């Protein structure tokens, strides 16, 4: 497990999604076919699918996911409209059950499976006028903050239970399976950072602590027993703090895989610059202002390679 430093707060989820699935630092228009890790796994013979239980046109995912090389993009219109959970859409447990169905069916047909899913349960905004359940003591918080935080934590509890059940299922699944689980951004809990301020959480972006509190998101790389045996790894311990575009690198480095040429190239970049954010870079383990980088030439080259890889399909 470790942390990713994203570049969004309270919304804009596709930024984190697309950094991960492409490995890109800067995005192309996605109006035509582009290289991605989905396409990479497809080239390795995997069935590659994306899932998100809300409408497919949201954030133009219908078009973009096709450009990224997914065989199918399952969304509200073509799969998940049978569910009526959080906000009228599938809960995490229902989404996970659909992932499992596709995993089992694909493996049964003799194929490997790569799935990129985005959950919806516990998406904000959170009820602020009514308290559903209480998880923290009221230390003279405003009613709005107290209600919002507790209602958010209720959603976290439900999502955690669904994730635990998915882990438990995978641990007993015969085929070697790895799950990378991460958040997109920290939650919007009301006006600005008011609720965070009441909780005593430093969100001052001029400080490293505040910057990390604002943009840091946990990730987990989980493997079932079959995968642990194949890779001779226990999948425990703390990994690096990185940008989301390096998450696939982190997995491949851990299991000893090189990946394609782009992944190998970005792994070299990662050795020097493991966090890339408009405010700070993390260079050789130390945060430095993005305007004062010691590796600006490397960043400039990365942008050029990024552009070339995005616009030249490896067919």
Regions found by a protein language model. Give the residues of each.
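Solvent-exposed soluble domains appended to multi-pass membrane proteins
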Residues: 1-315
């Amino acid at each position: 497990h470790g942390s990713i430093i994203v570049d969004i707060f309270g919304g804009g989820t596709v930024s984190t999604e697309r950094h991960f699935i492409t490995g890109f630092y800067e995005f192309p228009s996605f109006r035509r076919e582009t290289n991605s890790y989905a396409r990479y796994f497809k080239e390795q013979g995997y069935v590659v699918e994306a899932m998100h239980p809300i409408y497919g046109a949201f954030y133009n995912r219908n078009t973009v996911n096709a450009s990224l090389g997914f065989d199918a993009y399952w969304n509200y219109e073509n799969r998940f409209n049978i569910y009526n959970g959080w906000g009228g859409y599938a809960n995490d447990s229902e989404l996970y059950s659909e992932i499992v169905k596709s995993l089992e069916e694909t493996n049964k047909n003799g194929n490997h499976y790569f799935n990129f899913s985005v959950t919806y349960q516990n998406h904000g905004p959170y009820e602020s006028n009514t308290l559903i359940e209480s998880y923290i003591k009221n230390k003279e918080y405003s009613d709005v903050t107290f209600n919002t935080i507790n209602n958010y934590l209720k959603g976290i509890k439900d999502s955690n239970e669904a994730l635990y059940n998915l882990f438990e299922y995978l641990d007993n699944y015969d085929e070697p399976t790895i799950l990378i689980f991460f958040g997109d951004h920290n939650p919007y809990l009301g006006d600005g950072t008011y609720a965070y301020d009441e909780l005593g959480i430093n969100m001052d972006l001029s400080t490293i602590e505040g910057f990390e509190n604002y943009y840091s998101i946990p990730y987990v790389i989980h493997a079932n027993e079959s995968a642990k045996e194949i890779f001779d790894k226990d999948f425990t311990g703390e990994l690096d703090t990185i940008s989301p575009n390096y998450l696939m690198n982190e997995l491949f480095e851990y299991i000893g895989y090189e990946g394609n040429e782009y992944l190998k190239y970005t792994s070299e970049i990662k050795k020097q610059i493991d966090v890339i954010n408009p405010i700070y870079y993390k260079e050789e383990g130390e945060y430095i202002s993005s305007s004062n980088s010691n590796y600006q030439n490397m960043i400039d080259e990365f942008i050029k390679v990024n552009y070339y890889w995005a616009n030249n399909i490896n067919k």
